[in-house]
Amino acid sequence: MQQTTLAAEASYTGIGLHSGREVHMVLKPAPADTGLVFVRTDLEGQPQIHATASNVTSTMRATTVEENGCKVFTIEHLMSAFHALRIDNCYIEIDAEEPPVADGSSLAFFQKMKDAGVKELAAERKEIVIDNVYRIDDEEHNRFVMVLPYDGFRVSFTSVNPHKLIGVQYENFEISPELYEREIAPARTIAYEQEIEALRNMGLGLGGTLESVIVYNDEGWINPLHFEDELVRHKILDVIGDLRLAGPIRGHVIAVASGHALNTSLAKKLQASLG
């Protein structure tokens, strides 16, 4: 199997979920062995930040990568689309520290990439082929994420939410570009109304609106769902994005209540062992 890049440029302008700032993003084709590389066009010298697990520096409500003192955060939705569409190499030019949130899902990014087209390159693709059981646990909160050998890419996820409106949700998908676009990419970020003010006081969620976040309270959902189990589908979207920081995965991911911290810890373990 050959490495890939985009066949043409793709661009998107929008608001950052946490920063609340307008950002213009351009996805550009890149040669083999480049990887997925952010280019901060708003900074002097246009520094590059490689989207790899070893560059993860924070997982507070989003995944952050940092290189030589320059960072980009909330990258997981974009990484998820790259992973699902099997794009190995791309320059991501961005004029702020956070990609646009779009509607809180990865669908806009996936469709932009799909419309640009995927181009094969001469070099062989380097997959992270799972050869053993790799697992990260958070025993205190009864959470874990693991990956097993499997000839393909499958994700089985159980989300556990104490709110009666959501409760326990489970989904299990064999990941292909077609299934991802239909069943996972439209799943949006979810927030509890009572948490929003606290997040904003922390400088987070400043760009979140009912156009980009699903909000619920003790009475019910404030805006309509795309899926009855949209929370667990968005969790699957996130883990696909976070694990792409290790490389394209060939294996079966199984997770219970996992978030960015556990996901990226597993990505670091995979990168160190198999990358």
Please tell me what each predicted stretch does.
Residues 1-88, 93-275:
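C-terminal regulatory domains involved in ligand/effector binding and gene-expression control
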